[in-house]
């Protein structure tokens, strides 16, 4: 049995890609997209029809060019998501514009709009996860959306405070970023030789997983942003793992046994009183890595969103 199939025995495997051909090849349960992945996929010739449809939608929407671009951008994200859903049995994650990361109300409005666009294409909201950055405002927006039956995936998650606040808000799923945590520490204090058990990104997800299970939070933990297969194998047993096509390929090519590393704890603890906004901001702010990586992640997604909009504007 190859390692990918071995992991699938214990963990739901999710494809971290906007490339539909890769998704079909590796047969994941779910798929995640973001502006960076959509920008990459939009440059591939085989997806030209999805872009043309989004452009036509933008023109039909009318208004200023800026409004047409915004409409086309939302439609493109939904077009890719709907196309991906034809190749997977589960859900696709579609991201809310990162520039709304500090605006609860506009994030809610955008999420409802994306769900509406999906429903116009015959896709039920039970097959969609709305991705939001795990800022305080993003977490509050997700809490409201969950009450409306719109499940959310909280991304750019780097601190324990972010994870705990998401669980307390009743968020459906979180995506703690293993690789970007590893990158930050590796640039400052390289782990040499590399020992996966000491990898700060792996340790972060393990701690979150254990805490959620010990306190009976139903929020799904989906490890994300991997740099090497060792990180993935060390988190086998995590609820879900979202993996890029290049690492899915590596795992599929290795014929080695896979051992489950994460197992729900039998120890149970009472849940603490939910964090206030002040407590969340203080706790998150104590983690220099998390503060830096969250703000950087939002900026980078916003840059790629603008590039995607420029690509669409040139065609309108």
Curated annotation (Swiss-Prot):
One GO MF term attached to the UniProt entry: transaldolase activity
Root EC class: transferase
Enzyme active site: 131 (schiff-base intermediate with substrate)
One GO biological process term: carbohydrate metabolic process
Cited Pfam families: TAL_FSA
Major location (coarse): cytoplasm
Keywords: Cytoplasm, Pentose shunt, Schiff base, Transferase
Annotated Gene Ontology cellular component terms: cytosol
Subunit structure: Homodimer.
PANTHER family from the UniProt entry: TRANSALDOLASE (PTHR10683), TRANSALDOLASE A (PTHR10683:SF16)
Listed name of the protein: Transaldolase A
